[in-house]
Amino acid sequence: MTASEERLAALTSWHADWSGLRVVVYGLGVTGFSVADTLAELGASVLVVASRADHERAMLLDVIGAELLLQADLSAPPERLTAFGPELIVVSPGFHADHPLLLWADQQGIPVWGDIELAWRLRDKTAPPGSGNSPADWICVTGTNGKTTTVQLTATMLLAGGSRVAPCGNIGVAVLDAIRDPQGFDVLVVELSSYQLHWINRNAGGEVSPYAAACLNIADDHLDWHGSLEAYAAAKAKVYENAQVACVYNRADEATLRMVEETEVVEGARAIGFGLDVPGPSDFGIVDGILCDRAFLDDRLHSAIELTTLEELREAGLAAPHIVANILAASALARAYGVEPWVVRDVLSAFRLDAHRIELVRIEAGVSWVDDSKATNPHAADASLRAYPSVVWVVGGLFKGVDLDGLVKRHAARLRGAVLIGADRDLLRSAFQRHAPGLPVVEVDADETEHVMPTAVRLAAALVRDGDTVLLAPAAASMDQFSDYAERGRLFQAAVNEYLGGGADDGSSASRPGSGG
């Protein structure tokens, strides 16, 4: 091990000597800025390399004492980068593993960390009061879909149970920002993308060891980044590595069980399954409409603890099957951390989903209009479609290299019609021609963002019948026509209310599926 490698391996604390370490940060999004800000605070010499940058963040770099190299073409290492002589590179999640600058780093023998490894090494920065300077525990959550809902639920349960908790990671708050919060936390609930997981546990001294971890599901997604489903799944599996207490997996997704079986964990860590069927010992599931914990009780062979009921979830608008699965996963993580069953039940009675997640916009003339713009891949759209018996499906966008045939074939029988939006309509059109040739399929060919949803709503209204649901579940990313999934959802809701007349408060009030509103 070289002197430089020895120094990096020893950097496992906020209180270590980071001063003068030459670090290059790739990217200046939320994650990249948090990395640069943290390293500058530690006294490292920081150069940020990016192809584009938000003006405010670029200005702030100068304030914190970090240098910015902004260059549109990063197909080769810029001269300033090579002259800087980095001892370490910290990469933002958006950089592909085969990016030319990362290939250059590998050729030069320069270690590469992700933001999660850096945060893990620095996790002792702020310990909660009375902890004896012990850093916060980490509960890590990944999966193709349901991560954010599960993280929010888990964090809310932990908070209600008396813990000081921060939901962070891919949910929007950088983990490095959470570990630097001066108040300190007992536990971080960390949402991890496959991009972030790709970079963890690669370097001595930076091995993440979560208190508990969950992979909710695995399906085709981000294959353009990872190259194959196998590589994508391998990245997701890293969430379980070195787990201390619980590995929560999906009984309906055998890939997640294989991950647990094949992963090295801390001795004594348990595998905890969740599913919508009857649970076995050490699992969470449903018996006669009752959500049960058969994992965290003394007599789990013969009894179970009631958490809530499907009827109560239906009243709260949380009864869609994929949401129930998220609830069971979150309950397993919270119970692993010691949250009492009554706390779980109280949280579920008050919890509400974020906007654009199976959000009922209007019910008019027997037709439900539902916004699930958050369904940004086929797996999420599949879960959404399963919640409704007869659907006019508004679908399309950027498909990120995934296969659509299975999704269309699986749901053809429940479709009244389809309205295609987005840049990759030809892929959708072909899938419908192969698997639903008799289905009415219409297309929105508007290029201007403001015209897409009004046209889609008008076309959907022409196809729909009494009792149907018009469902925006795009199964695709939004960046071809919208700034993000939230804008796509907002414009859909506005178009629905404009077409039907009045606002969301006229006629039937907006609520969640099954809320009785």
UniProtKB/Swiss-Prot annotation:
Signal sequence extent:
none
> What pathway does the annotation place this protein in?
Cell wall biogenesis; peptidoglycan biosynthesis
Q: What catalytic activity is recorded?
A: UDP-N-acetyl-alpha-D-muramoyl-L-alanine + D-glutamate + ATP = UDP-N-acetyl-alpha-D-muramoyl-L-alanyl-D-glutamate + ADP + phosphate + H(+)
Q: Where does ATP bind?
A: G143, T144, N145, G146, K147, T148, T149
Q: What is its EC number?
A: 6.3.2.9
Write out the GO biological process terms: cell division; cell wall organization; peptidoglycan biosynthetic process; regulation of cell shape
The question of whether Cell cycle is a record keyword is answered with yes
Q: Which domain of life is it from?
A: Bacteria
Locations listed in the record: Cytoplasm
Q: Does the keyword Metal-binding apply?
A: no
Q: Give a GO cellular-component term.
A: cytoplasm
Q: Entry's Pfam families?
A: Mur_ligase_C, Mur_ligase_M, MurD-like_N
Name the UniProt key words of this record, in alphabetical order: ATP-binding, Cell cycle, Cell division, Cell shape, Cell wall biogenesis/degradation, Cytoplasm, Ligase, Nucleotide-binding, Peptidoglycan synthesis
Q: InterPro entries of this UniProt entry?
A: Folylpolyglutamate_synth_CS, Mur-like_cat_sf, Mur_ligase_C, Mur_ligase_C_dom_sf, Mur_ligase_cen, MurD
One molecular function GO term is: tetrahydrofolylpolyglutamate synthase activity
> What function does this protein fulfil?
Cell wall formation. Catalyzes the addition of glutamate to the nucleotide precursor UDP-N-acetylmuramoyl-L-alanine (UMA).
The protein's matches in NCBIfam families, at most eight in alphabetical order, are given as: murD
UniProt cross-references to HAMAP family, sorted A to Z: MurD
Q: Which family does the entry's similarity section mention? A: Belongs to the MurCDEF family.
Record's protein name = UDP-N-acetylmuramoylalanine--D-glutamate ligase
The organism is: Leifsonia xyli subsp. xyli (strain CTCB07)
